[in-house]
Amino acid sequence: MKMLKFTIEQIVWQEVPGEVSLAFLFSGCPLRCKGCHSADAWKEGIGTELTEDYLRGRLKRYRGLISCVLFMGGEWQPETLQKMLGIVTQAGLKACLYTGLEREELEAVSDGILPYLTYLKTGRWQMELGGLDSPTTNQKFIDLRTGEVLNRLFIKDKPAPKIIPITTQPQAAAFQTA
């Protein structure tokens, strides 16, 4: 079984709406989307190995503080990713995968992981379409329990800027002379 290596590990609040997630960004993504914000992680084999013991230790450390584990990539190592997802679900946490693949492509590459996932983000990054916070995006964020696409949770109403008129009025003279 091949190993997964991560270049970033962090607690995130925005990537999975309504969840506090422990996120791992894996190296070695073969998709290489133009404009990718994680291009520095494309090189295979860089980073720290995510072992079963390491993951269990992190889940223990953050018990009660996180509700989800987010894997950014890793679907190119389906057996290893499935094992990690099993650890997450056994710990009673939700699991999310961010992939640039479409769902049909993911099923063809690593069909065994879908039953372990609570959430799935699909779609290659296309700069001209924007990310999940864009109404024109090609990407989808799906709650796999219900099949509902949750993109609306990423799009913030952007109110018109509040304009406060500034007027300069001459101040009354404090002292009047006679």
Sequence positions of predicted segments:
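Short, basic/glycine-rich phosphate-binding loops at helix/coil junctions
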Residues: C33-A41, R63-I66
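Structural recognition of alpha->loop->beta junctions
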Residues: R56-R63, E107-L129
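Conserved glycine-rich "GG(E/T)P / GGGxP" loop and the immediately following alpha-helix
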Residues: L65-V88, T137, R145
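Conserved, mostly hydrophobic/aromatic
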Residues: F24, C33, L120
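Canonical radical SAM enzyme core domain
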Residues: K43-G57, W76-L114
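Classical nucleotidyltransferase
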Residues: L117-A178
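N-terminal [4Fe-4S]-dependent radical SAM core
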Residues: M1-L25, P30, S38-E44, F175-A178
